[in-house]
Curated annotation (Swiss-Prot):
It catalyses: uridine(38/39/40) in tRNA = pseudouridine(38/39/40) in tRNA. The lineage of its organism: Bacteria, Pseudomonadati, Thermodesulfobacteriota, Desulfovibrionia, Desulfovibrionales. One of its GO terms (molecular function) is RNA binding. Keywords: Isomerase, tRNA processing. GO terms for biological process: tRNA pseudouridine synthesis. The keyword Isomerase applies. InterPro entries: PsdUridine_synth_cat_dom_sf, PsdUridine_synth_TruA, PsdUridine_synth_TruA_a/b_dom, PsdUridine_synth_TruA_C, TruA/RsuA/RluB/E/F_N. Belongs to the tRNA pseudouridine synthase TruA family. This is tRNA pseudouridine synthase A. The active site is at D57 (nucleophile). Substrate binds at Y115. The gene is truA.
């Protein structure tokens, strides 16, 4: 048998996550694994199982999901990427297929992951191409969010940011970097550029303690897509969405940035704000050795 490594992108809007739901009543919910495995099995001539780096939830997107699968040696000559893509629906795409070491594991060999979360800072109008891919929050105090994010970076017990559903031996995780970056929808001359990791905070063009936008400010009164990036060695169930929910609560003024350490110290999920919607979240990249991941162990 030979092991293949697949890099996969998908729009999660009409998908019920990655994992096939074998015990669900028929018709089974449509999942990424449930779509891919029958195709790859037919091509391999036998039943196969795909193992992913992370099991994304319903509605979550990916442009850098990684999975591995074992196929018979005599099938190595097949153009797997082209052949699989020819059979896929429009919301799933294979970006790359390559042979991997026999002991490569998409989940356990990962050094870290990067997730992105997209916010739309007005509720008045969302461009059609962004429907199902952003959280329309309305205006936010991004500078207060910056201050709150600094409390989340680093190694902490994130029990207050874990939803139930997955057994883990420890809720301690390391968030190496949280950054916010404006997308191409920002107006010319806007103040924000992609920030440095909060572990070594530096804000380009403005100070993180600057007051929120007011009338006439480049960030005020306009529709903006704002992208947050979270990098870490691993994340608990819905941890990124829960951190995003907290940051938005701070941005709306429902919490103060300095409330974050106290919430984290409770280790109590009920003390943290509600989970952010799945629609804004994307699994953007999974890092494996050898690579230039700056936080490699």
């Amino acid at each position: 048998m030979a092991r293949l490594r697949l890099t996969i992108a998908y729009k999660g809007t009409d998908l019920h996550g990655w994992q096939v739901q074998e015990h669900a009543t028929r018709p089974r919910p449509r999942t990424v694994q449930g779509v891919l495995e029958p195709i790859v099995s037919r091509m391999a001539g036998e039943q196969v199982r795909l193992h992913a780096a992370g099991r994304t939830d319903a509605g979550v997107h990916a442009d850098g999901q990684v999975a591995h699968v074992d196929i018979p040696d005599h099938k190595l000559g097949v153009d797997w990427q082209k052949a699989i893509n020819a059979q896929l629906p429009d919301d799933i795409c294979i970006l790359d297929v390559r042979r991997a070491a026999d002991d490569f594991h998409a989940r356990f060999d990962a050094l870290g992951k990067r997730y992105t979360y997209r916010l739309w800072l007005t509720r008045r109008f969302i461009p059609p191409k962004l429907h199902g891919q952003v959280w329309a929050t309305g205006p936010l105090d991004v500078y207060a969010m910056d201050r709150a994010a600094r409390h989340l970076a680093g190694t902490h017990d994130f029990a207050a940011f874990q939803n139930q559903g997955t057994d883990v031996t420890s809720t301690v995780r390391t968030v190496h970097a949280i950054r916010r970056c404006p997308s191409g929808t920002l107006p010319a001359g806007a103040l924000l550029t992609c920030s440095e990791p909060y572990t070594s905070w530096r804000c380009t063009g403005t100070h993180p303690d600057q007051p929120p936008a007011t009338a006439g400010h480049p960030l005020a009164g306009i529709g903006l897509e704002l992208v947050w990036s979270f990098e870490g060695d691993g994340f608990l169930k819905q941890m990124v969405r829960n951190m995003m929910g907290l940051l938005v609560a701070v941005g709306r003024g429902a919490l103060a940035a300095d409330d974050v350490p106290g919430i984290m110290a409770t280790l109590d999920r009920s003390r943290a704000p509600a989970t952010a919607p799945a629609c804004g979240l994307t699994l953007s990249e999974v890092y494996y050795p050898p690579c230039d991941y700056p936080y490699a162990r």
